[in-house]
Amino acid sequence: MEKAAGLAATAFQKLYQDPVAAFPRHQTLGRTLADVARRHGQPETRIEALLPRLGLAPALLTRRPGAVSGGELQRLALLRLLLVRPKVIFADEPTSRLDPITQKQVIDLLCETATAEGCAIMLVSHDPALVARTADHVLSLGPDAANADVTAPRVVGALQ
């Protein structure tokens, strides 16, 4: 990918709606994360540093993607993209396959981590409550709406 506006291709990272798509099934999570770190010139120690921030146990790295919970896998997917130090995270329905408690944990973690790492989040969501709780600015798309750069409460009120 070419540099756009002076940013490296790794400046933009996607947090998958289905975290299973972020990991090869045949490889341990630790090996996948180590490969990502190496490919992007990051020390593998960054993996260990991010694990506790994301509430993850190091033992998870010895497992394959199918052997961890959905919430754990989504947090590991977040760790995966944070390894490359993105400037923008494109989060496409990042909580859609999670139970309500895990949804809140993952979105809170995403927002806290993005703030700590100094990156922006582009959140795609069909959940007005989630948008109201997390967004500073909203672009609402639909048959009756194409509102750009308006505050979240105004758009959420119009959507309900």
Please provide the spans of the model-predicted regions:
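ABC ATPase NBD coupling module
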Residues: 1-13, 27, 39
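Q-loop/switch helix immediately C-terminal to the Walker
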Residues: 18, 25-41
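Conserved ABC ATPase "signature" region
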Residues: 44-59
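Conserved ABC ATPase signature
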Residues: 64-68, 72
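Hydrophobic anchor residue at the start of the ABC signature
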Residues: 78, 90
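Helical segment within the ABC ATPase nucleotide-binding domain
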Residues: 104-117
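H-loop/switch region of ABC-family ATPase nucleotide-binding domains
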Residues: 125-126
